[in-house]
Amino acid sequence: FYEKIQKAGITNICIHKGLLPSDYEESFKGSWEYATVWDVAKAAKDWPGLNFIIYHSACQQFLELPDNQLAHFEATGEIKWATDLARIPEEHGVNNVYGEIGTVFANSCVTHPRLAAGLLGTLIKGLGSDHVCWGTDSPLYGSPQWQIEALRRLKMPEEYKKKYGFAGLGAPNGAIKNGIFGFNSARVYNLDVRSSMGRLSGDKFAAIKKEVQVAGGFRTNRSNAAYGYVNTA
């Protein structure tokens, strides 16, 4: 499989991990282990020319409030399975493992920002700030503007810096957050965003943006409302 991928010129392997209910050992009996990162380290070490991008950063919790996860993190300093992911580079000597934060950031960034900060701190400390990739799962959560705003505003609690050795997240428009928002993924996919800015500034989306600005500006019309899937059953 990996040999065929490399022969085809593919360098990025995106793998869905985590996101299981609390009763996963019973409801996913015989298969839940594949949602953990037990198999990532060997693959990354055996195939250093490939990038392994772990979706949802392998966070286990799903379909429940983050209260228990936050309490567990503040008691132990660990986020189930995401901490295991973050330990892989140091424990196995690899630098081709990435953490994507779709859904798991959305689940906590507004109601439990300390957990969101703990997640980012864990990933940045273990994987490196340049190995954390943005994700919103917006087909499920609707317009991602509220998630973008949340990351721009999020700060690392001083308590976490002292207790866990986490670095700060930097300025709202700083290198760390801009890297997470796009530059990290651009590098992985060999996209030179900076050299393309000239062309992008004159494309169709730029024209639409200009129309909105003329009509009142993004600061006036922009909304953090989320429009996504709604279960009416």
State each model region's role.
Residues 122, 126-133, 141-233:
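Mid-to-C-terminal alpha-helical segments outside catalytic/metal-binding sites
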Residues 1-134, 159-169, 173, 220-223:
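Catalytic pocket-lining loop regions of alpha/beta-barrel enzymes
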Residues 137:
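Active-site glycine-centered loops adjacent to acidic/histidine catalytic or metal-binding residues
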